Each structure stands twice: as C-alpha cells, then as structure tokens.
C-alpha cells in the first residue's frame, strides 16, 4: 500500500467574510495574499520517511479558482523533494468528466471542491486512483 496524504486548503479573496459569503462556511480560510499554514505543513512532511504522494485540494470562492491554484502551486514548488499534486477546479472538472464517461452520472454535490464532504470525497477518490 502506498501512503497518500490529503491536505485540503481553503482560499478566500478577503481577510474577513461577510454574512452572505459562500466561503463563510469554511472555518479556516486563508486569504489569497497570505501563505497560511501550508508551507509549515509541507515543511514538517519533509521529515516523514516513506512518505508517498501528497494531494493538496484547493477550495476557493468563485472567481479566484485559478489564482488560488497558482498560489498553492507556488508554495508546493518550494518543496521539490516532496511528491505534491495540486488539485484545483480544473483538475476537479476532469475527474467529474471521467466519472460521467464511466456512467457514474454527475456527482458534483458529492465529489468536488464545494463543501467539506465533497472535498473529502474528492481526496478519497484521488487517493484510490493512485
């Protein structure tokens, strides 16, 4: 069995959330302009022997999906000795497309980057593929 570490990241375009924001449901969203805890997490994973693939799931509010994924990719690039796959909206769409091709239907509510459960499930699907 190959170990897989799944790290969800929640990125917001603002420092504080207003009442009606979709992202307000996420407890610890990181502003787009700040690194957050991901660098520290990846730094600590450098010390783990036998570490397999690391999957970083990038959840963001609509309109900043690409910027959020680019931010996380820049952070992951600082750790070239780790095997890090950054999964943003584009990659999540490819997973959805493949599931539809396999006749599983459209499962965007259950598997994707919108909501804690769907994000967890996307990570589990990706880990199972590896």
Summary of predicted features, one role per range:
Residues 68-130:
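Active-site-proximal specificity loops/subdomain of glycosyltransferases
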Residues 1-67:
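N-proximal low-complexity "stem/linker" segments adjacent to membrane-targeting elements
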